[in-house]
A protein has these predicted regions:
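Secretory/organelle targeting and membrane-embedding segments
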Residues: 1-151
Length: 151
């Protein structure tokens, strides 16, 4: 799943606007994204197997087949420089879903020195399509604190 579906979603999310809306222009922009991913460092890759997988019907008792993979990568471009992308996929996880979570850069410390969390947005593609936002909220009359909110 990581090598096809999730990279396709990553390319769609991170590509620059194509000069035209024909399929070749869109494909070219996606290819630019994929080519801008530097080689992965082993310390940014996690692989595993869910407990009990070797007891599944048709699975060898000594199977080393991964049922989970997670990786952190970056895209070497002006827009995404320094923004980590996390891709995870696996079987038998606590939540069954396909989603994209984008954590935006840390806000500047211009808001009266508040220790602000990073804003994010979440696009869940399955089991149902939802869009959620997590952001810092500073009420006009509150000058001493900020609250992280999720919608």
């Amino acid at each position: 799943m990581i090598q096809n579906h999730l990279f396709q979603i990553l390319a769609n999310l991170a590509m620059e606007p194509p000069p035209r809306t024909d399929s070749e222009s869109i494909r070219d922009e996606k290819v630019k994204v994929l080519k801008a991913i530097p080689p992965l460092d082993q310390k940014n890759i996690v692989r595993g197997q869910f407990r009990g997988y070797q007891n599944e019907k048709g699975v060898a008792q000594d199977s080393k087949m991964e049922t989970f993979a997670a990786l952190q990568l970056e895209i070497d471009s002006w827009r995404w420089k320094g923004v980590p992308f996390y891709i995870r996929a696996g079987k038998c996880l606590p939540v069954t879903c396909a989603e994209i979570v984008v954590r935006l850069r840390q806000p500047p410390t211009m808001y009266q020195g508040f220790n602000l969390t990073r804003n994010d947005f979440r696009l869940r593609l399955s089991p149902e399509v939802t869009l959620a936002f997590g952001m810092n909220v500073i009420a006009p009359d509150r000058i001493t604190s900020a609250n992280a909110r999720k919608w």
